[in-house]
Design a protein with these regions (language model features):
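The feature encodes the CheY-like receiver
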Residues: 22, 67, 95
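Short amphipathic alpha-helix used as the core "switch/output" element in two-component signaling
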Residues: 50, 72-83
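Two-component/phosphorelay signaling modules centered on CheY-like receiver
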Residues: 20-40
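Acidic, metal-coordinating helix/loop segments flanking the phosphotransfer/catalytic sites
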Residues: 41-59
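Conserved acidic carboxylate
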Residues: 17
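Acidic catalytic/metal-coordinating carboxylates
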Residues: 44, 70-73
Length: 139
């Protein structure tokens, strides 16, 4: 990887979300909060694998339920291939079992979509090393 490519990778965030409206909402939030970042988005696990291989994003926002993959299992696969990549698993489902599975798979944290407007930007800032980690826990 060249220095230019490496810099671009460190600035890239990938959204993996099958619902088009949610994907666009996430993109809008991230572009407003982090205008210097490159925001990519895909709708399924296969596209996520390919995009990670090609672009090596610094951060992946991973939907738990994808049409062709379980987002937590996909997180584990991506973390094996790209250990330095940060992953935030997102779901409409809350519950300690989901949080524990996501963390065990290598996710940095687990975001319940009901808390998106309050928790997304701080979680992303911490994952990207822009803000210091605090004891936010998981939402």
């Amino acid at each position: 990887m060249t220095n230019e490519t490496d810099n671009r990778c460190r600035k890239t965030v990938l959204i993996v979300e099958d619902q088009a409206l949610m994907r666009q909402t996430l993109r809008d939030f991230l572009q407003d909060a982090f205008p210097e970042r490159i925001i990519l988005d895909v709708a399924d696990g296969a596209s996520a694998r390919e995009t990670c291989k090609t672009h090596r994003p610094a951060l992946v926002l991973m939907d738990k339920c994808l049409p062709d993959a379980d987002g937590i299992e996909l997180t584990a696969q991506l973390k094996q291939l790209y250990p330095g990549m940060q992953v935030i698993v997102m779901s409409c489902r809350s519950g300690e079992i989901y949080v524990q599975r996501a963390l065990a798979a290598g996710a940095r944290t687990y975001l319940v979509k009901d808390n998106l407007t309050t928790d997304l930007i701080p979680m992303v800032a911490v994952a990207l090393g822009i803000a210091p980690a605090t004891d936010m826990g998981t939402s």
